[in-house]
């Protein structure tokens, strides 16, 4: 949430109790962008002040996500690097009469905080003797200390209009072993107490935070005032101190960015995990097939302001389309197949047709796709009694088969329920792509795969996770807002052999359908593809 500019470099700080989402990506792009602009280096700092919510899994995934976005950091730091200094600073504050041990319950402390329009009530322990406070603070950092039995609070101003100034908690007891320091510590600093001081210790010049940290800024400054007093530099308060600056966070329509709600989605198995392709997490977007360049392009387009805004998911998807159009390999896949038999094509004969990998980039070359008598086409591409403006396959009309021949439909076969099981057509032998006969005007072009030279595949389609534009602002239980149609599975699709060999990380365009990527579940025997985004924004049309 907070990001640090240091002399000749930038500091990016992250909580290590969850996975990064696209909102974090906006901050990361700013940090590394500033470092690049001023020929500096970006360092990372992990806020590991709450061992009960942290583990190395989160650290490893955060580092992977930052690398995937295309950034390289300088050094990696942890708030735990400064636990000794923070402890000494807290002891100094107690000795100066600026901090005390409070043995009230969390509920009692919250009740005594008051409201924004009424002052708080002083704790009965506020004027506890300094020596007693020091002894109890030492007791907090023992294995016998009971979580919630006491906290260290700063003695500031219980009548201050800023609620964060009303004797904030500096330390609490946590008996969970720390993933770096083990059982050395049993009392841990609060984030508000640790991050400003860590900035000061590192020589950070500016702390760039999201807008919810605006009311925290006076407290950030106050603790640094105390720290400069401890260091004997209180006479020059404005020298060599970090300053906090805020910018707006990234919010997207039809999803949530709240870490609590994202945890809830995962814990209640409402999604398949943190990398569910419907999630706004970077690992989810990567699995779905979003490119890091498209995410950075989107973030650059919305900019940084002082006003919170709700950004349309369609803008992000437009950036994804724009980027993938330049890099995705074009392949053929049939999601809802129906058999097409070319009745006048020689039995047992095949041809290798040349297919351009990407018309946007000639250097990507070509591949071959096998053509034969028996093909699969999309069921929706055939209509027996078609309206005038239906330019796909219908009896008596010609269509072009992509990269192959012009064919004319001659009829179809149905089962006892009237369901079409086979379509028949005749091909024009001199209309092959590249031949002179292929130049005649035919309005419809269909994609296809050879029935004997394709691979059966599973295709997963995703849509908006929530039905409402701004679920975070809706007062209803967010379970009621989930989109029941956000996931569809198509287990009986067919893809050309060239597509079946593609791996996660390789961008594909299923021609006339959309952009896709092989899923982590994909195998050579049963390829699995995730739909990244359609060629057009169908959601907007559905919800007009």
Give the positions of each predicted feature.
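N-terminal Rossmann-like or analogous alpha/beta NTP/dinucleotide-binding catalytic cores
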Residues: 1-122, 212-242, 251, 256-258, ...
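Basic, alpha-helical terminal appendages of large translation-related enzymes
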Residues: 1-7, 15-19, 41-47, 52-56, ...
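Short hydrophobic "helix-edge" motifs at membrane interfaces and signal-peptide entry regions
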Residues: 10-12, 181-183, 279-282, 502
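Short beta-alpha connecting loops at secondary-structure transitions
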Residues: 47-48, 205-208, 280
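Long, charged, mostly alpha-helical binding arms that flank functional sites
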Residues: 239-319
């Amino acid at each position: 949430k907070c990001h640090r500019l240091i002399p000749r470099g930038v500091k990016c700080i992250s909580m290590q109790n969850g996975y990064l989402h696209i909102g974090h990506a906006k901050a990361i792009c700013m940090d590394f962008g500033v470092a690049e602009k001023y020929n500096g280096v970006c360092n990372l700092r992990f806020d590991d002040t709450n061992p009960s919510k942290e583990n190395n899994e989160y650290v490893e995934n955060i580092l992977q996500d930052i690398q995937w976005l295309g950034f390289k950091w300088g050094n990696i730091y942890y708030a735990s690097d400064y636990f000794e200094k923070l402890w000494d600073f807290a002891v100094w504050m107690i000795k100066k009469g600026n901090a005390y041990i409070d043995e009230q319950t969390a509920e009692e402390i919250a009740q005594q905080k008051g409201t924004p329009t009424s002052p708080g009530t002083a704790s009965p322990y506020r004027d506890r003797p300094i020596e007693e406070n020091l002894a109890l603070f030492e007791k907090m950092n023992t294995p016998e200390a009971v979580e919630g039995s006491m906290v260290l609070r700063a003695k500031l101003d219980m009548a201050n209009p800023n609620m964060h100034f009303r004797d904030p908690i500096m330390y609490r007891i946590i008996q969970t072993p720390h993933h770096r320091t083990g059982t050395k510590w049993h009392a841990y600093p609060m984030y508000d107490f640790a991050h400003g001081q860590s900035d000061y210790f590192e020589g950070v010049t500016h702390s760039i935070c999201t807008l919810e940290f605006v009311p925290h800024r006076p407290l950030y400054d106050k603790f640094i005032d105390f720290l400069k007093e401890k260091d004997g530099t209180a006479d020059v308060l404005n020298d060599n101190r970090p300053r906090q600056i805020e910018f707006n966070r990234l919010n997207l329509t039809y999803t949530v960015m709240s870490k609590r709600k994202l945890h809830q989605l995962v814990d209640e198995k409402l999604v398949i995990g943190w990398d569910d392709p419907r999630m706004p997490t970077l690992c989810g977007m990567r699995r779905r097939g979003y490119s890091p360049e498209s995410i950075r392009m989107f973030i650059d387009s919305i900019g940084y302001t002082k006003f919170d805004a709700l950004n349309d998911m369609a803008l992000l998807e437009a950036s994804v389309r724009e980027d993938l159009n330049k890099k995705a390999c074009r392949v053929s896949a049939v999601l809802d197949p129906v058999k097409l038999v070319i009745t006048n094509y020689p039995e047992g004969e095949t041809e290798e047709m040349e297919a351009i990998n990407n018309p946007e980039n000639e250097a990507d070359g070509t591949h071959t796709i096998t053509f034969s008598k028996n093909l699969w086409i999309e069921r929706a591409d055939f209509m027996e009694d078609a309206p005038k403006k239906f330019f796909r396959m219908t009896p008596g009309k010609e269509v072009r088969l992509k990269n192959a021949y012009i064919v004319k439909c001659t009829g179809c076969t149905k089962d006892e329920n009237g369901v079409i099981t086979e379509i028949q057509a005749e091909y024009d032998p001199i209309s092959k792509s590249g031949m002179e006969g292929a130049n005649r005007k035919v309005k419809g072009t269909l994609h296809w795969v050879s029935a004997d030279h394709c691979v059966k595949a599973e295709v997963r389609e995703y849509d908006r996770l929530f039905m409402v534009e701004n679920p975070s602002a809706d007062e209803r239980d967010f379970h009621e807002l989930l989109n029941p149609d956000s996931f569809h599975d198509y287990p009986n699709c067919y893809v050309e052999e060239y597509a079946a060999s593609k791996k996660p990380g390789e961008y594909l365009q299923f021609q006339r359908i959309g952009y896709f990527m092989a899923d982590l579940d994909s195998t050579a025997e049963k390829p699995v593809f995730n739909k990244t985004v359609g060629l057009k924004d169908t959601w907007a049309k559905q919800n007009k």
